[in-house]
């Protein structure tokens, strides 16, 4: 039975028993930055189990894609070398939220395994928690399992908990017996770590809530969470012992062999590559891009490990990206999002391959040299150098060292890392301002509804210290009980404006959160005096706020437009929105084409002209996501979120300030598109009057160019192209004339060659020639003089260019590189090259005649 058939059969089995099929959630957990990746089927139901979310169903079934690489689940070094370690796997699971409990969970599992899949009863074992008599009774008296194949286990292996506190409960695990040909004892025995008895399904019965004291309290509605690895059950159904022998992996291993040129399908490197393409492709599909921290670094580690194993198989060219199509063939039908993202995924992988290829070979040479010393430990300094200079993740170096029976000095590596961090801190140009201590009430924000509000001063800070009052010209931070000022957040700059009281005027230059919920108004007291307890009128700069709103609303339209034009892989990676401009960073692995930029710009302007009402609404995070709201990648949101929608074109979670109608933005212009990091692009744009002024300035510059060309603006590009063609033609003619002139000069100059110990030596200048002509003349002299040493010089714009040549018969004693350095030093320069030809430059043209005159004596001394 194929893996795809098992997956489908599982979903249909539970759907027929009242379960709702829930699609796999992304590998990046929504609204939970504390969890690196989705690593189990229950992750997307976590809030349901905790009672913080309700679903319109009480039974669910899913096939969840999971990644375990990084943190406590980091088994990367084992992947490819054992039968069941993977970075990516699929978890089949059925769930009950306060509906059925132990009895049906066990009976469903037994029916599916023995009925739907036809696994012989005698091949299955079960374990229960030692104190779980209820589960044991169901197995023995309702399922009818042989008592010799039911094991009570008292360890934590059979008691599951989400954390130190919260929902928890006993487990019942189902094992498959691969037979006596495989070593290992039954679960709970001394030899249980062997591979004969393999866990295939874990049934978790959440029936308690553990409090802070550790005491267990029965849950009013017990729930069920189960998980069965698709790869493991496929191995059982296909009667193979290793997951890498199932149909899904066989096709990927064959593809890996094809693109690497490997003939041995049992090679562990092919298993590594086959495993890693699944993890990498799905991580990229779900918005992760290779980087140097967090999820991006885990992806980079997996990618580079796969690349290194290809290198180990002799493949020095990019190959890993070629496997994306093979993966789509195998898994695309079950996960259409992979099919949609195939081009983007392949592009990101290829870019990372090319990036790593620049340093891989040199890094391997350094590592091979270090490993060849015969030491049992690889020094931390070498590990750090490979990491810092050549981009080798530490576990990649450890992987290679382990193949030689060598361990790495992690303590030494950590010492080097700490020293680097200390150096970085010492050389930093800026230091973070010390946080202001504040223990009062939070600031109440009114800025969505008004730009002016009465408030009371709660705290004043001057030079980082709390004070009771401030006077004229004092720079300070003011904390108010209420404010219309927006504090910098989500990429939007803080508001500016003024605070007015009967005794003074405070100019607010910026607004920042000094801690959660507390707004600091930064600026200077322009006149008078202010003290804690004073009443003030807080007034936001209306023009700046309005222009900022134009730009912020435009970023939402831009984000949606980019996803339409470039694809759904585009996600926001950063933004800056202030009164003058907007800057938007997004995931995309190549520079945008000019037509794509225009498409995006036109799409945004079309939405502006539609004059959508900009609607804001407060709702739960889950409701917002269900309505299609875009959330920032990796951001943590509260229980209630603010949703900003512009028609059906853009819906995002956002706490910023916006226009009332999209038409208020007026006009949108993209002024720049660039790369800021691998896989991250940046767009800079203008809106409203600023966009209009930019456009008018461009038109004015075009008119000036057209006037200079004596052409109409619409004909300027064609006229300029003609002029450039003429210039290129004239440059060719000049080069031809220079070459002819050099030929004439060379005929007369060749007679100046001196003979030293049977060798012809010529050192002279050429006038009005470029470097290309200089080289051609050098070759001409060498061909005509046969056994010779030639040095030629020319002067252009007060700079000296030198070239030296030595015929092959003389390079054992006379090196062109040594000669050119000798001459170049005399004219204030330096150079280098091969033994037969070298080039240099200089800054002292007046010294050139004397330098060339010294060549014969140098030749004589070095013969």
Swiss-Prot record:
- Which Gene Ontology cellular component terms are annotated? cytosol
Q: Where is Zn(2+) annotated to bind? A: 552, 556, 654, 658
Q: What is its EC number?
A: 6.1.1.7
Query: GO biological process annotations for this chain's record?
Result: alanyl-tRNA aminoacylation; negative regulation of DNA-templated transcription
Compartment(s) where it occurs, according to its Swiss-Prot or TrEMBL record:
Cytoplasm
What keywords would UniProt list here? Answer: Aminoacyl-tRNA synthetase, ATP-binding, Cytoplasm, Ligase, Metal-binding, Nucleotide-binding, Protein biosynthesis, RNA-binding, tRNA-binding, Zinc
Gene3D superfamilies, from UniProt?
2.40.30.130, 3.10.310.40, 3.30.54.20, 6.10.250.550, Bira Bifunctional Protein, Domain 2 (3.30.930.10), Threonyl-trna Synthetase, Chain A, domain 2 (3.30.980.10)
Q: Which PROSITE patterns match?
A: AA_TRNA_LIGASE_II_ALA
Provide the catalytic activity annotation: tRNA(Ala) + L-alanine + ATP = L-alanyl-tRNA(Ala) + AMP + diphosphate
Q: Name one GO molecular function term.
A: alanine-tRNA ligase activity
Q: What class of enzyme is it?
A: ligase
Question: How is its cofactor bound, per UniProt?
Answer: Binds 1 zinc ion per subunit.
Identify which cofactors the protein needs according to its UniProt entry. Zn(2+)
CDD domains, sorted: AlaRS_core
Entry annotated with the keyword Zinc: yes
Recorded superkingdom: Bacteria
Q: What does the UniProt function comment say about this protein?
A: Catalyzes the attachment of alanine to tRNA(Ala) in a two-step reaction: alanine is first activated by ATP to form Ala-AMP and then transferred to the acceptor end of tRNA(Ala). Also edits incorrectly charged Ser-tRNA(Ala) and Gly-tRNA(Ala) via its editing domain.
UniProt note: domains? Consists of three domains; the N-terminal catalytic domain, the editing domain and the C-terminal C-Ala domain. The editing domain removes incorrectly charged amino acids, while the C-Ala domain, along with tRNA(Ala), serves as a bridge to cooperatively bring together the editing and aminoacylation centers thus stimulating deacylation of misacylated tRNAs.
Tell me its family.
Answer: Belongs to the class-II aminoacyl-tRNA synthetase family.
Q: What is this protein called?
A: Alanine--tRNA ligase
The scientific name of the source species is Nitrosomonas europaea (strain ATCC 19718 / CIP 103999 / KCTC 2705 / NBRC 14298)
Species classification:
Bacteria, Pseudomonadati, Pseudomonadota, Betaproteobacteria, Nitrosomonadales
């Amino acid at each position: 039975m194929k893996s795809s058939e098992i997956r489908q059969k599982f979903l249909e089995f539970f759907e027929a028993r009242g379960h709702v099929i829930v699609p796999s959630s992304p590998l990046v957990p929504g609204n939970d930055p504390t969890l690196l990746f989705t690593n189990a089927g229950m992750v997307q139901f976590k809030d349901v189990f905790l009672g913080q979310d309700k679903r319109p169903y009480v039974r669910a079934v899913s096939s969840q894609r999971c990644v375990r690489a990084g943190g406590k689940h980091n088994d990367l070094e084992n992947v490819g070398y054992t039968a069941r370690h993977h970075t990516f796997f699929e978890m089949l699971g059925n769930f009950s939220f306060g509906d059925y409990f132990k009895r049906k969970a066990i009976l469903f599992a037994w029916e599916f395994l023995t009925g739907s899949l036809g696994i012989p009863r005698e091949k299955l074992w079960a374990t229960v928690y030692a104190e779980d008599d209820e589960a044991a009774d169901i197995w023995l008296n309702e399922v009818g399992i042989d008592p010799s194949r039911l094991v009570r286990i008292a360890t934590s292996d059979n008691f599951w908990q989400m954390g130190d506190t919260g929902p928890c409960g006993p487990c019942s695990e189902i094992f498959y017996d691969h037979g006596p040909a495989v070593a290992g004892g039954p679960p709970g025995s001394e030899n249980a770590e062997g591979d004969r008895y393999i866990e295939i399904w874990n049934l978790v019965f959440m029936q308690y809530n553990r409090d802070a004291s550790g005491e267990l309290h029965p849950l009013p509605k017990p729930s069920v969470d189960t998980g069965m690895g698709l790869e493991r059950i496929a191995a059982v159904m296909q009667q193979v012992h290793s997951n890498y022998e199932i149909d899904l992996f066989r096709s990927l291993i064959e593809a890996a062999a094809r693109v690497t040129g490997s003939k041995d399908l049992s090679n562990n490197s092919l298993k590594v590559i086959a495993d890693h393409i699944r993890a990498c492709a799905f991580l990229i599909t779900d918005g992760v891009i290779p980087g140097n921290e967090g999820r991006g670094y885990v992806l980079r580690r997996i990618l580079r490990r796969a690349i290194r194993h290809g290198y180990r198989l002799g493949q020095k060219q990019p190959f890993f990206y070629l496997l994306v199509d093979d993966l789509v063939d195998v898994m695309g039908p079950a996960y259409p999002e992979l099919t949609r993202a195939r081009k983007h995924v392949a592009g990101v992988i290829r870019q990372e391959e090319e990036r790593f290829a620049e340093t891989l070979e040199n890094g391997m040479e350094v590592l091979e040299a270090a490993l060849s010393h015969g030491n049992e430990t690889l020094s931390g300094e070498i590990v750090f150098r490979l990491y810092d200079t050549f981009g080798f993740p530490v576990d990649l170096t450890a992987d290679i060292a382990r193949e030689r029976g060598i361990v790495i000095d992690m303590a030494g590596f950590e010492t080097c890392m700490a020293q680097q961090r200390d150096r970085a801190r010492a050389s930093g140009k800026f230091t973070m301002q010390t946080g202001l201590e504040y223990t009062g009430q939070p600031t109440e924000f009114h800025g969505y509804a008004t730009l002016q509000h009465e408030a009371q001063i709660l705290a004043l800070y001057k030079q980082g210290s709390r004070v009771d009052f401030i006077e004229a010209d004092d720079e300070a931070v003011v904390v108010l009980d209420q404010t219309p000022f927006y504090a910098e957040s989500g990429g939007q700059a803080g508001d500016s404006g003024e605070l007015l009281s009967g005794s003074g005027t405070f100019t607010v230059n910026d607004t920042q959160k000094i801690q959660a919920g507390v707004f600091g108004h930064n600026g200077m007291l322009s006149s008078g005096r202010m003290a804690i307890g004073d009443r003030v009128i807080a007034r936001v700069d209306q023009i700046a706020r309005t222009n900022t709103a134009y730009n912020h609303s435009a970023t939402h339209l831009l984000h949606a437009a980019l996803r339409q034009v470039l694809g759904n892989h585009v996600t926001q990676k950063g933004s800056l929105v202030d009164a003058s401009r907007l800057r938007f960073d997004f995931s995309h692995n190549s520079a945008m084409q000019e037509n794509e930029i225009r498409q995006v710009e036109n799409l945004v302007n079309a939405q502006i002209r539609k004059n959508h009402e900009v609607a804001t609404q407060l709702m739960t995070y889950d409701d917002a996501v269900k309505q299609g709201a875009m959330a920032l990648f990796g951001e943590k949101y509260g229980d209630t979120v603010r949703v900003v929608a512009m028609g059906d074109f853009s819906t995002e979670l956002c706490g910023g300030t916006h226009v009332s109608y999209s038409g208020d933005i007026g006009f949108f212009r993209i002024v720049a598109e660039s790369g800021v990091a691998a896989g991250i692009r940046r767009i800079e744009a203008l809106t409203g009057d600023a966009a209009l002024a930019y456009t008018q300035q461009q038109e004015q510059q075009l008119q000036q160019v057209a006037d200079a060309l004596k052409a109409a603006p619409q004909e300027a590009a064609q006229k300029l192209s003609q002029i450039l063609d003429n210039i290129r033609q004239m440059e060719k003619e000049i080069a031809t004339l220079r070459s002819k002139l050099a030929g004439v000069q060379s005929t007369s100059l060749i007679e100046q060659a001196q003979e030293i110990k049977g060798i012809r030596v010529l050192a002279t200048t050429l006038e009005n020639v470029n470097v290309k002509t200089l080289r051609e003349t050098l070759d001409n002299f060498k061909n005509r003089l046969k056994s010779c040493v030639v040095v030629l010089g020319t002067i252009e714009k007060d700079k000296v260019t030198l070239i030296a040549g030595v015929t092959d018969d003389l390079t054992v004693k006379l090196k062109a590189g040594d000669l050119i350095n000798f001459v170049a030093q005399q004219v204030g320069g330096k150079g280098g090259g091969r033994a037969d030809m070298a080039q240099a430059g200089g800054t002292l043209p007046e010294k050139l005649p004397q330098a060339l005159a010294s060549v014969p004596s140098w030749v004589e001394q070095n013969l």
